[in-house]
Curated annotation (Swiss-Prot):
One of its GO terms (molecular function) is DNA-directed RNA polymerase activity. Keywords: DNA-directed RNA polymerase, Nucleotidyltransferase, Transcription, Transferase. One of its GO terms (biological process) is DNA-templated transcription. It comes from Prochlorococcus marinus (strain MIT 9312). It comes from the Bacteria. In cyanobacteria the RNAP catalytic core is composed of 2 alpha, 1 beta, 1 beta', 1 gamma and 1 omega subunit. When a sigma factor is associated with the core the holoenzyme is formed, which can initiate transcription. This is DNA-directed RNA polymerase subunit omega. It catalyses: RNA(n) + a ribonucleoside 5'-triphosphate = RNA(n+1) + diphosphate. It is an enzyme of class 2 (transferase).
Amino acid sequence: MNVSNNAGIDSNDLAKRGESLIRKSTNRYLTTVRIAFRAKQRRFDDFDGLLEESTIKPVQRSIIELSDEQDQPDLLPG
């Protein structure tokens, strides 16, 4: 993850990750819904104080997480 500004990550890296998620998916709509659902979960986790304070927005974090899960499935538990 490349840090480029105070707000979080490199926008080019984020765009490439998002494009990769969409390109590798069989259903663009479901991928978009997964990103939105994960972002909503992260937002509530942040609100409840369960996660450390982050400068990365929930949608950005969800794209990064889903991209990492897609690219490196061996990192997933189970």
